[in-house]
């Protein structure tokens, strides 16, 4: 599929706002879009969906096999999409410790031209050195346009354009400084899209700014250029947790990867959704229940009082139904959760651990997992860990994974499993290797 990537020299350059504005502007022009977020981030994809009206897939070149990324790209083409719009993560060449898994790697894999968003707030002629360095750093990654962001005045814009003119990299537009074009944040990143009361107005405003200040015809020329190679379409996927999987989905359980659901459906699984915050129970015929990550620490009191949800999960576990929790879902499977104010809330009590958001410590990074039983995955896995909550008490139980970091350093064992119930702080993304 033809498309392009919005990337930047560093985080905080404005690429998310630019991506959202372009998605909405292209949607208004009638383009059929395939939004993509590079890396493991859960929050930006919900904004992409709001802007485009289409589900956004995470494509992670560190955690996913190249074949899976190519297959997911092909799947988007099969669904009728015509333009893939990818938002990079961090800086264009930033990845794991060795630099692998960067946005540049994804652009190379999918043959996407890169549009570089540069924060110009505190520079003028120095931008030429920055853009030149980025354009020359990897010859297999093509930077085919620049968007100047946070430009202070027409004079500032003229200086920037003059500095870049000798490089031959097209300047697609210059966006003025505008504090209104920023999104609210919290501890794991942006506030979730569903909680942004003025999101629709923000997206329309961002699209108006893109239409007014970016040469959309020049951008189209970039994404319509001939591709150098085609992606492969078929690849093995992670086995589903069951045949009929009930997935918790609401503001407390919002962090789930679309590619997992798509892959499970392709392998014949049925997926249904329920809201613990609305005190809903999973479907009675579900043979697997998935509690993904999210923000249970912000909704602990409501979860503690959700009697129908609590009873249904407990009954399902007693019947031997697979119950699997990741990160926030893992915390909810434990005995208690201490919120930021130090209040302890009873959780499901299906795993012998107590967690705290009051005693915060950042845990962040890619992980290599060796399953130790309890799940349908018996091959090495790649995952991501990102949370502030800590385990304050943990009783003896079987472990779920043996863990290494991205550089291969042994981090010991993690997660718990009791009967058919299991969980950990790891967000599983893909398996490692080519055999399912």
UniProtKB/Swiss-Prot annotation:
Keyword Nucleotide-binding assigned: yes
SUPFAM superfamilies: Class I glutamine amidotransferase-like, P-loop containing nucleoside triphosphate hydrolases
Database matches in InterPro entries: CbiA/CobB_synth, Class_I_gatase-like, CobQ/CobB/MinD/ParA_Nub-bd_dom, GATase_3, P-loop_NTPase
Protein function: Catalyzes the ATP-dependent amidation of the two carboxylate groups at positions a and c of hydrogenobyrinate, using either L-glutamine or ammonia as the nitrogen source.
Family to which this protein belongs: Belongs to the CobB/CbiA family.
Domain comment (free text): Comprises of two domains. The C-terminal domain contains the binding site for glutamine and catalyzes the hydrolysis of this substrate to glutamate and ammonia. The N-terminal domain is anticipated to bind ATP and hydrogenobyrinate and catalyzes the ultimate synthesis of the diamide product. The ammonia produced via the glutaminase domain is probably translocated to the adjacent domain via a molecular tunnel, where it reacts with an activated intermediate.
HAMAP family per record: CobB_CbiA
Misc: The a and c carboxylates of hydrogenobyrinate are activated for nucleophilic attack via formation of a phosphorylated intermediate by ATP. CobB catalyzes first the amidation of the c-carboxylate, and then that of the a-carboxylate.
Protein name: Hydrogenobyrinate a,c-diamide synthase
Source lineage: Bacteria, Pseudomonadati, Pseudomonadota, Alphaproteobacteria, Hyphomicrobiales
Gene that specifies this protein: cobB
